[in-house]
Amino acid sequence: MSDFGINLDAICDNVKKGQTESRTGSQLSNRSSRRMDFVDDEELSTYFNSKASVTQSDSCSNDLEIKHSIITEAVVCDESAHVSADAIQEKDETVPQMDHRIMKWMLDSHDGVSLNGGINFTKAKSKLKETENEITEMKSKTNLLVNASVGINSNVGAFNPINQTIKTEAVSDMFEDEDIEGCICKNCPYREKYRKLRSKMKNVLIDMINEM
């Protein structure tokens, strides 16, 4: 294993930071160019293994920011165990394990997940077909109510309604039996109000379609 190096100059600079606030660029460059002081890896391991962890009390400064910076530059701490000089190299990456509950969910799932790694889109296709049927039904109902021609103004780049024609014969579909003898709708006092309201709603619908 290669020697474990600690930048002692960086630690000293952090300690002196609270005492001297102003530094010139040449001083900083000189300190950053100093060589690393290497120590024996076995001695370093022995020292750190004799301590539960490296804490703030190991710093000689009362400045919390400097304490944390010294701890960060000195060693990576592990609160649950002793710190070794080669702890970083010995650390293995954690491999996520498949939980039995996840496997059971995949086996019992009815949402289209298959065991072969593929995806079954049967349920999704049926839902899509139902949605398409609903859209088609809505369009057919709209066509019964409105017949609007929408043009595009190439100069402005916006929709420009050219021709709008309302099928007025569809307005009285609720009163289609009003000519039959004994129909109560024939003499309804709200008949005209309903017609006006229905016509107004259709005009609003035409405006909405033209703006889309």
From Swiss-Prot:
InterPro entries: Rotavirus_A/C_NSP5 (IPR002512). Its cofactor is Mg(2+). O-glycosylated. It holds the Pfam family Rota_NS26. Mg(2+) binds at D86. GO terms for biological process: viral genome replication. Keywords: Glycoprotein, Host cytoplasm, Magnesium, Metal-binding, Nucleotide-binding, RNA-binding. Its main location: host cell. It comes from the Viruses. One of its GO terms (molecular function) is ATP hydrolysis activity. It is found in: Host cytoplasm. GO terms for cellular component: host cell cytoplasm. Homodimer. Interacts with VP1. Interacts with VP2. Interacts with NSP2 and NSP6. Plays an essential role in the viral genome replication. Participates, together with NSP2, in the formation of viral factories (viroplasms) which are large inclusions in the host cytoplasm where replication intermediates are assembled and viral RNA replication takes place. Orchestrates the recruitment of viroplasmic proteins such as capsid proteins to these factories. Belongs to the rotavirus NSP5 family. This is Non-structural protein 5.
